[in-house]
UniProtKB/Swiss-Prot annotation:
BP GO terms, sorted: monoatomic ion transmembrane transport
Record organism: Porcine reproductive and respiratory syndrome virus (isolate Pig/United States/SD 01-08/2001) (PRRSV)
Virion surface side, ranges: 2-25
Descriptive protein name: Envelope small membrane protein
Subcellular location: Virion membrane; Host endoplasmic reticulum membrane; Host Golgi apparatus membrane; Secreted
A Pfam family assignment: PRRSV_2b
Coiled coil (UniProt feature): none
Length: 70
């Protein structure tokens, strides 16, 4: 009877261990997904800053020419 109880308890321990491993896997997956999301936001922000800086510098360079045309 003790051997049967030992096997049943080991089965529950294994099931609980698998449950914890799956929870940890889900948390790791969500953390990676969040990291990619933040990296994408940062990339878009940097692209906007660079593009706006380039457009501002170009308009500053060509402003006398534009004022002659206008």
């Amino acid at each position: 009877m003790g051997s049967l109880w030992s096997k049943i308890s080991q089965l529950f321990v294994d099931a609980f261990t698998e449950f914890l491993v799956s929870v940890v896997d889900i948390v790791i997956f969500l953390a990676i997904l969040f990291g990619f999301t933040v990296a994408g936001w940062l990339l878009v922000f940097l692209l906007r800053v660079v593009c706006s800086a380039l457009l501002r510098s170009r308009s500053a360079i060509h402003s006398p020419e534009l004022s002659k045309v206008l």
